[in-house]
Amino acid sequence: MKIITVYGSSKVRPGDADYEASVKVGRKLAEAGYAVMTGGYYGVMEAISKGADEAGGHVIGVITDQIGKRYNLEPNAYIKELVNYTELRDRLLYMVQKADGYVAMPGGVGTLHEIAETWELMRIGGVQTQPFTCYGPLWETVIHALQGSPYLGEGYEGMLTISHSPDDVIENLTV
């Protein structure tokens, strides 16, 4: 089964538009036959896990002591397979290396770091290039600003797509 790593904010809550969109994305991913892998905690991570679980999908949570112990967090209730790392950087590398594709849902600096790290690893050949889509207007603005700047060197073009709906996510992962 192919695994899609999903990045996103821990801040969104049930009822928030981004949380509900994430539930739909998780459901669509599971219905398309993908396992989902997230950072294992709350917000987008929980919403993706919930949607995938409700659709009968396999949910992998990759947690880290560095976050869990600092903020006294437990993994979300939808995880079927739990992977634990001590350091955040090891968690991210695992999530990048084990994935067959990536989705970045709305998020902040942590999600931006995950996008940048994954994008750069694909560009330099540190991991195999896989489909990678960023969801929503925030990432569309950020990605287009980077792509239009003189600071982005060669090799970045065409690696990321922008999705505006859960259906777009599936379409962009299968092209």
List PLM regions with ranges:
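Short, acidic/small-residue loops that bind anionic groups at enzyme active sites
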Residues: 63-65, 105, 119-143, 155-158
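Active-site/ligand-binding-proximal alpha/beta "capping" segment
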Residues: 89-126, 133
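Glycine-rich beta-alpha loop segments
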Residues: 1-60
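Acidic/glycine-enriched connector segments
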Residues: 43-104
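A charged, well-structured terminal subsegment
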Residues: 94-97, 101, 153-175
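Glycine-rich, charge-decorated loop segments at or immediately adjacent to ligand/cofactor-binding or catalytic sites
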Residues: 42-47, 139-149
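Short glycine-rich anion-binding loops that position phosphate/pyrophosphate groups of nucleotides
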Residues: 9-12, 65-67, 107-110
